[in-house]
């Protein structure tokens, strides 16, 4: 049973401005593991990576129903890729998490669906 749905869209140029020489933004948004991946990226690929993670984490917080804040922080949520490249969301939730991330020339968007783990 679906217990939550969240979606977020972010302008790539907004993220590009925030990461331009500002390590604090990356430390606030990305986990250590995500920052290690980001170190190997440059230019538009780095912007897409950070924007996708930002949107995924915002979408998750909306699906949970709290938003980013005291109960859920950016660093409580990690986005990884499975063996086939599919994004997966790592968090402490008991729910099954379905994540989709997409990019266009101007935007990154993510959708999260939370499913009850009991069948």
From Swiss-Prot:
Keywords, sorted A to Z: Cytoplasm, Fatty acid biosynthesis, Fatty acid metabolism, Lipid biosynthesis, Lipid metabolism, Magnesium, Metal-binding, Transferase
Compartment list: Cytoplasm
Source species, domain of life: Bacteria
Catalytic activity: apo-[ACP] + CoA = holo-[ACP] + adenosine 3',5'-bisphosphate + H(+)
GO cellular component, one term: cytosol
Gene3D superfamilies given in the database record: 4'-phosphopantetheinyl transferase domain
Any GO MF annotation of the entry: holo-[acyl-carrier-protein] synthase activity
Keyword Metal-binding: yes
Binding positions (Mg(2+)): 8, 58
InterPro entries: 4-PPantetheinyl_Trfase_dom, 4-PPantetheinyl_Trfase_dom_sf, ACPS, P-Pant_transferase_sf, Ppantetheine-prot_Trfase_dom
Principal subcellular localisation of the protein: cytoplasm
BP GO annotations: fatty acid biosynthetic process; lysine biosynthetic process via aminoadipic acid
The protein's required cofactors: Mg(2+)
Keyword Lyase: no
E.C. number(s) listed in UniProt: 2.7.8.7
Role played: Transfers the 4'-phosphopantetheine moiety from coenzyme A to a Ser of acyl-carrier-protein.
Family classification: Belongs to the P-Pant transferase superfamily. AcpS family.
Protein name per Swiss-Prot or TrEMBL: Holo-[acyl-carrier-protein] synthase
């Amino acid at each position: 049973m679906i217990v939550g749905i969240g979606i977020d869209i972010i302008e790539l140029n907004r993220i590009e401005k925030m990461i331009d020489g500002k390590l604090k933004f990356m430390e606030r948004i990305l986990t250590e593991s995500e920052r290690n991946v980001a170190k190997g990226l440059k230019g538009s690929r780095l912007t897409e990576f950070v924007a996708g993670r930002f949107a995924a984490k915002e979408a998750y917080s909306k699906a949970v129903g709290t938003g980013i804040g005291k109960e859920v922080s950016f660093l409580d949520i990690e986005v990884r890729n499975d063996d086939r490249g599919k994004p997966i969301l790592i968090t402490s939730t008991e729910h099954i998490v379905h994540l989709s991330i997409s990019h266009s020339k101007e935007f990154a968007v993510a959708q999260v669906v939370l499913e009850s783990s009991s069948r």
